[in-house]
Regions:
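Nucleotidyltransferase catalytic core that binds NTPs
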Residues: 1-167
């Protein structure tokens, strides 16, 4: 079986905006993803949502409608309790065990990675693509900066085997 390249793009999407859709469209032009799963958080532990889960889910469905290779994954919206990335990553890795999974996140989220639940395990089981976000520079002396220095690759092919790399 030929493995697929699957991106996972999670967030609160409160609200979803043009920046979110532009990032995905740009990634699809640059990287040969077979699919990108957009996953709205159900109960994000780092943020308080203003809109209801149903409203955010509807916004995400509308924003990404018609973009090839995009699927909206509702698993976190329907999960009880906090939405931890490690749980979702484990589920996706089990479901798509023959495929290459890349977790997509903004530099703002990655700069706080060491505050995430089971963050070290998360970093060790999945490859991450960090998207630069205006006004959110990663301090090279922070934990996130250190992780980038230790795990960074500039070659997408490096993500086709193993885990724990950062692009």
């Amino acid at each position: 079986m030929i493995s697929k390249l699957i991106g996972v793009f999670g967030g609160t999407f409160d609200p979803v905006h043009n920046g979110h859709t532009k990032i995905i469209q740009n990634l699809l032009e640059l990287i040969p993803f077979d699919e990108i799963k957009v996953i709205p958080n159900g109960q994000p532990p780092h943020r308080t949502s203003v809109c209801s889960n149903n409203d955010r889910l509807e916004m995400v469905n509308l924003a990404f409608k018609g973009i090839n290779q995009i699927s909206v994954d509702e698993r976190e919206i329907h999960r009880e309790g906090p939405s931890y990335a490690i749980h979702t990553a484990r589920e996706i890795l089990e479901e798509y065990h023959q495929d290459n999974i890349i977790w997509i996140m903004g530099s703002d989220a990655f700069s706080e990675i060491d505050t995430w639940f089971e963050w070290e395990d998360f970093l060790n089981i999945i490859n991450i693509l960090v998207m630069a976000r205006p006004g959110s520079e990663i301090d090279s002396t922070s934990m996130a900066g250190t992780l980038i220095l230790e795990r960074q690759t500039s070659n997408i092919d490096d993500l086709s085997h193993g885990s724990g790399k950062i692009l």
